[in-house]
A protein has these predicted regions:
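Glycine-rich phosphate-binding P-loop
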Residues: 105-106, 146-166
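Catalytic cysteine-centered active loop of the rhodanese-like fold, especially the PTP/DSP P-loop
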Residues: 70-125
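Conserved NTP phosphate-binding and transfer environment spanning the P-loop NTPase/kinase superfamily
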Residues: 233-239, 243-361
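Short, acidic/small-residue loops that bind anionic groups at enzyme active sites
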Residues: 116-135, 237-243
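Conserved nucleotide-sensing/catalytic segment adjacent to the nucleotide-binding pocket
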Residues: 166-234
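A conserved segment at the C-terminal end of the G1
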Residues: 111-116, 159-170
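Flexible, polar/low-complexity N-terminal or interdomain linker segments that lie immediately upstream
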Residues: 1-38, 135-143, 147-151
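Positively charged, proline/Ser/Thr-rich regional signature most characteristic
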Residues: 17-90
Length: 361
């Protein structure tokens, strides 16, 4: 089986992550759930109960007994089902790579079984641990990258503009959260480890000579903390401020937070309750009278579904809460501002700035 020794070297971990080749994560579902990589699919050799049993056996009786128990647990029909799943994945993704926790026994066994079916997939040397360490290294060195920041008041369309810019990283998309009290998505956020891995890979895929564009964020996005090296760059990098009138921002928020969820099948009552709970989170800072006003307007809007009524409560929320908060924060960043203006002005300013930085690099 010498040909199976074509597993990647530890030094190739960065290339594996950069290329985004399909990955077969052979760890147990519990291990996978704590954090993996965007290109990974969990097809475990051992499920959680089997892994626990093998681990207990290893501690009590040693490696040989643990291996024997593993072979007993994954035998017969169970083994055939798992080989079928790996083989089907390999057939769909012949360029896939295998990994387990350290690139050891689990991936070696699956590699051997797959070879017997005609699928010769390499395994990642060092396994998950090697890939994870590579991601942490990318984040630790983030301060070496050239970074600029796109800011602007809530609803100004920063994320939309970010999507049109080369070499941008959408932190909110990676965190599956729009970064405010109202920013939760219908699906849960990734684990902190998965978020860090995805962010590191996104940075790795932008050439080191290029400028990375990030959206201005606080220290956390929903429940996820931004890695400290990235947060330091957000606090220090040149800032481009997108300026959009409040009515246009309210219309944008209405489309994203009301129209889009309803179009995705969220019922009106559920959406109203979600927005009401989000409002309750900021009630103390908003104040009782203003909270009551917005709560009443929100209920009235959902009772009649009129766009103008929705725009009323959204504009009040911007006027009374989000705009003053952002303006206060911006006061602390005035010396970093390179340009302010509408989307087209900011796009051109960013292009000029990045071109100038590239020439002086």
């Amino acid at each position: 089986m010498a040909a199976l020794a074509d597993s990647l070297l530890d030094t190739d971990a960065l290339r594996v992550l950069r290329e985004g080749r399909p990955l077969v994560d052979l760890r147990s579902p519990g291990e996978f759930a704590r954090g993996a990589f965007p290109a990974a699919t969990n097809l475990p050799l051992l499920d959680d109960a089997e892994r626990a049993a093998v681990g207990t056996c290893y501690k009590a009786h040693g490696q040989a007994a643990a291996i024997a128990l593993g072979e007993q647990l994954v035998s017969g029909a169970t083994r055939e089902r798992r080989i079928d799943a790996w083989s089907a994945f390999a057939a769909r993704h012949p360029d896939a790579l295998l990994y387990c926790w350290r690139g050891g026994l689990r991936s070696e066994i699956v590699q051997r079984w797959l070879a017997e079916t005609g699928h010769r997939l390499p395994r990642v040397a060092g396994g998950y641990k090697s890939l994870r360490q590579a991601c942490l290294g990318v984040l630790d060195r983030f301060g070496e990258r050239d970074v600029v920041v796109l800011g602007g008041r809530t609803g100004s369309g920063k994320t939309r503009l970010l999507a049109e810019i080369d070499d941008a990283i959408d932190l909110e998309a990676l965190a599956n959260h729009r970064g405010s009290a109202f920013g939760g998505q219908l699906t849960p956020q990734p684990t902190p480890i998965a978020f860090e891995n995805a962010l590191a890979i996104a940075a790795l895929r932008i050439d080191a000579s290029r400028t990375i564009v990030l959206e201005d964020e606080s220290r956390t996005i929903g429940q996820l903390g931004i890695p400290e090296p990235v947060h330091r760059e957000l606090q220090a990098a040149p800032l481009f401020v997108l300026e959009v009138p409040r009515p246009a921002r309210a219309a944008h928020i209405y489309d994203e937070y009301v129209v889009a969820p309803l179009a995705c099948g969220v019922d009106r009552f559920t959406l109203e309750q979600r927005l009401s709970r989000s409002l309750a989170r900021i009630a103390r800072r908003l104040g009782g009278t203003r909270t009551a006003h917005i709560e009443a307007a929100l209920a009235h809007a959902f009772a009649g579904s009129e766009r103008d009524v929705h725009l009323h409560w959204i504009e009040r929320l911007l006027e009374w809460y989000y705009d003053p908060m952002y303006d206060h924060q911006l006061e602390q960043k005035l010396e970093r501002i390179v340009a302010r203006g509408d989307a087209e002005h900011i796009r051109r300013a960013l292009e000029r700035h990045v071109a100038e930085r590239s020439q002086t690099a």
